[in-house]
Amino acid sequence: MLLIVLCAACNDPYDGDTFVVFDTQPAATYLSSRSEDFSEWIHIMKYADLYNAVNQATQRFTLFVPNNTAVQEFYTRRGVSSIEELGTEYARNLVSYHIIQDTINQATFIEKEGALAKRTVSDDVLMVSFGSAENGGGGMRSVYLNSEAHVLEFANPVSNGYVYVLGNTLT
């Protein structure tokens, strides 16, 4: 009799409800949600075996991600049609050059021209520069990394850091 009473008294008021733990996704999942923009870079990250590495919940990252057009232009400059022609080691170095294992928010990123305080996973320094008004620049539309990669989007938040979108691939 007691068992019947206990079973009847167990009603879950949240039964059937869906709960979201995070309203943002980890870095690689975010890129996949925008595959129309980043499918080429996702392919490079997977080929380099670094795609899942930037999905870790216990680590913080800042990713500088070239869009598909930027990756295609990079291939053209290198005289190849895919990352496989350059090899796995090259791909790992390339992806590592585009990742900082720490967070850099937008305010810190644009704070001053010059070297970012944190180094990339490949232990390189990235330099922030601002285009001049005389060259059609000025403001947020004229921010570059290493004077070669135009920053198109700043500090898109992900659950484990930030994603910056580049109009050029860092080399």
Question: Which ranges hold each PLM region?
Answer:
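Sec-dependent signal peptide recognition
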Residues: 1-3
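Bacterial Sec-dependent N-terminal signal peptides
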Residues: 6-33
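Post-signal-peptide N-terminal segment of Sec-exported extracytoplasmic proteins
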Residues: 29-77
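Envelope-exposed proteins and targeting segments
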Residues: 59-62, 124-126, 141, 152-154, ...
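FKBP-type peptidyl-prolyl cis-trans isomerase
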Residues: 64-74, 156-171
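Aromatic/histidine-rich interaction motifs
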Residues: 76-150
